[in-house]
């Protein structure tokens, strides 16, 4: 299947299916831009039909996750055939003027053997659509995970089913990720097809390593699904937990940093549009999500002269590349006449009056002005500054002399920046002293990203350390904390974690950083199976040993499960005790790996290893 040179105007609108224009195919009208995009010239009728088919398959697979590939294809063909008939021979058909989501849901409801959706199909729109959305299930295990195929078998399958395989890939990804943005799925499908073509092209070449080829290229396919899915889940989690106001504040900060030359009106319009897009996307409404996304991109590129000088090349790209390009574009240069400070938000005599009359607008202007001046700060840090400013005005405007009260705001700000810099400096000191292994042990799940950030940022001077670390670390830490809080919802940890996850998004990281040992936690009992070791601990293969070292951490040479159980057994363990156990663990490993019955030796010597905390 040819790689589609998609243009910048994919628009699956909820408007009428038939539109009176020169373009006869209504879907084509929504899939092709208004004649300004040169890339559209590369889309022939067959490619447009293929693109419509893919979009329909994504929606049906996400809505009816249990359907077979054949059933999804059948429904997608029914919808695309209707679109074709509406423009050629049956323009007066009443269904041709129905919204697309009505047509999609009616197609599902006409299918047999779908008892799960009977109640939804009995409802009227928009309640029917909401019912369908509520049945989407993204939990692990709802659909069996992907099984990694043998490379040779995969290439054989590709050669025999080359034209249908990309569609099958779209189907499998869509039903496992019912909330994943359709543009992401379309994009990774292109990468998947390219990977299969490239790796299987030389399958008969004896010098060609198929496994290595797939191993090298698979991240281009898997990484966007995982990362975009995580970011989307994270954003939707913020929206659900903290509401639209928090999402708007976060986007206001990010857009102001990215486009410092854009005026306040333009920025707030983008903020509102993006917040509305996330509401539709987080509901799982793919049609509205794609329409919102396209309209935002169209607005940004149409008004790029007043938004940013860094996105011209992005706006010349096809849609699927355009969106990613703009998101990853560097921040535009700050206006030459931009003052270094925003003292008017502290010193202005009418500040309390404006705060009382238009609180959210005043705070938005402060965040906008402060963020566009400080691209070196993370979005989370700027939100904390905004929260501090709001609290300051809440307090000071109630007093008789707000001037004296507000003047201390600058000192509070300096203190917060200093504390943030100190955290970064401490982390880098640990990195420089202990190296990668210890750093990986501190951030077990996100090891590779953290060590990359450490090696990149910790070599810089102090004045450049904070910008580098804030930009890279804060997003990663924010994603980690978001995942912790989502897990806390289903498996509560303790009241302190609940407070950090619920009270304030902006203050979540410092709140988590100040958590103490849970005094109500009941330690695990010491049982024979709590610390068990097997022969694989004695591996001599360098690669496995290296992996195990990464798993153990340095200086704590303990396996990941043992480390967890150790802390659960002795939550108040000291650094001295950890050091003693490290030495004993190393000695135990060296001794028992020489024995004939290694596991019996481990079972006996583990008590000696744990003696520093058992005495």
From Swiss-Prot:
GO terms for cellular component: cytoplasm; extracellular space. It holds the Pfam family Serum_albumin. Sulfated. The keyword Kinase does not apply. It is found in: Secreted. One of its GO terms (molecular function) is metal ion binding. Glycans are attached at residues 137, 157, 472. Gene3D superfamilies: 1.10.246.10. The keyword Nucleotide-binding does not apply. Residues 1-15 form the signal peptide. Residues 27-218, 223-415, 416-609 form the Albumin domain. Binds copper, nickel, and fatty acids as well as, and bilirubin less well than, serum albumin. Dimeric and trimeric forms have been found in addition to the monomeric form. This is Alpha-fetoprotein. It comes from Gallus gallus (Chicken). The gene is AFP.
